[in-house]
Amino acid sequence: MEFATVSPPDPGTAAAARARQDTLTKPRGALGRLEDLSVWIAACQGQCPPRQFERARVVVFAGDHGVARCGVSAYPPEVTAQMVANFDAGGAAINALAGVAGASVRVADLAVDADPPDDRIGAHKVRRGSGDITVQDALTAEETERALSAGAAIADEEVDAGADLLIAGDMGIGNTTAAAVLVAALTNVEPVVAVGFGTGIDDAGWARKTAAVRDALFRARRVLPDPVALLRCAGGADLAALAGFCAQAAVRRTPLLLDGMAVTAAALVAEHLAPGARLWWQAGHRSTEPGHALALTALDLEPILDLRMRLGEGTGAALALPIVRAAVAALSSMATFAQAGVSDPSAHP
C-alpha cells in the first residue's frame, strides 16, 4: 500500500512552545529533556500550551515466526498464543505498567500460530505463523500488503475512537530474530553487530540466532532497497502491521511512543514507507538489544529511558508515558514570571 504524504508537527506551535518555556518560573533550559518533549507534544497537537493526554492507547501486535524452530529463543513458540490470552486477561507486564501510566491495552493477533481467543483479537489476522526466513519468505506479496493495511487500519481505528497518543508493542517468539534482519539490512551491518540475547538465550542460542540472521540477511539484501519486499522476505505479518501502524499514526498526526527492538525495527521500515514519519515518534526507551541502538541511531531518536529492559510488549514505552505527561504538565501548568510576580533574570541583563 501507499501512505499519504506525512507533514511534520507544526513548526509555528513549536516556536511558540519554546518561547513559552523561556517565560516560565525557572532558569531557561532547567527542565532539560522535558522541555524538548513539551515542545514536540505542543507541535504534534498544534496548540500551546498542549493539553494533557486523555486516551493513551497501547496496541500489542502478536505473531509467530517460523524461525523460532531454529532454536533462537529460550521459550517455545506456543508461548505467543498463551501470552495473547494473558494480555487479554490483564495479567501481563504491559497491563500492569500501562495501568500505572494511565493507558489502556489492546492486543491484535496478526500471525499467531493458533486460533485467536475471539473475533475482536483476530479481526485483522493475516495467517497462522510467518515463514522461516532462513529458507523462505516470511509472507507472500499479497499477505504483506494485507498486513501493512491491517496495521494502518488499526491506527485509524484507534485515532477515530479518540486515542490522542499511541504506544506500539509486540509479542512473538522469534520476532527479535526477524527484527535483527530488518535492522542489519537497513543499516548495512553484519549479524554479530545486530544480534542480542533476546529472551535470555545462552551463548549457544546466540550462535544459533546469529546464524539464522546471517542466512536470512543473505536473502534479504537481494530485495533492497524496497521496504515492502524486505517485509515480505524477512519480516512477518506482525512486523509488517507494526510498520503500517507507525506510518499511519504519522499520517493521522498522532504522536507515538516506540518500544524496543521489534517495534523500532518495524518503525525503521515505516520511515522508508512514509518519509518523515519519525518526526511524530519518540523512543520510549533503549533496550539492551544491540540492534535497537542501531535502529534508534538510524532514526535519529534519543530514548527517554534506559532501564536495561528487553521485554517488549510496549513496556518501555509505557514507562516513558508518565515522563511525557510531566512534560505536558510543566508547559501547561507552570506560571510565567509575569503571572507569578517573580523577577525574570533575562529581563535584567
UniProtKB/Swiss-Prot annotation:
Assigned EC number: 2.4.2.21
Gene3D superfamilies, alphabetized: 1.10.1610.10, 3.40.50.10210
Catalytic activity: 5,6-dimethylbenzimidazole + nicotinate beta-D-ribonucleotide = alpha-ribazole 5'-phosphate + nicotinate + H(+)
This protein's record includes keyword Zinc: no
GO molecular function: nicotinate-nucleotide-dimethylbenzimidazole phosphoribosyltransferase activity
Pathway: Nucleoside biosynthesis; alpha-ribazole biosynthesis; alpha-ribazole from 5,6-dimethylbenzimidazole: step 1/2
Active-site residues, as the UniProt record annotates them: E313 (proton acceptor)
Main function: Catalyzes the synthesis of alpha-ribazole-5'-phosphate from nicotinate mononucleotide (NAMN) and 5,6-dimethylbenzimidazole (DMB).
Family: Belongs to the CobT family.
Protein's recorded name: Nicotinate-nucleotide--dimethylbenzimidazole phosphoribosyltransferase
Protein's organism: Mycolicibacterium paratuberculosis (strain ATCC BAA-968 / K-10)
Lineage, top ranks: Bacteria, Bacillati, Actinomycetota, Actinomycetes, Mycobacteriales
Gene giving rise to this polypeptide: cobT
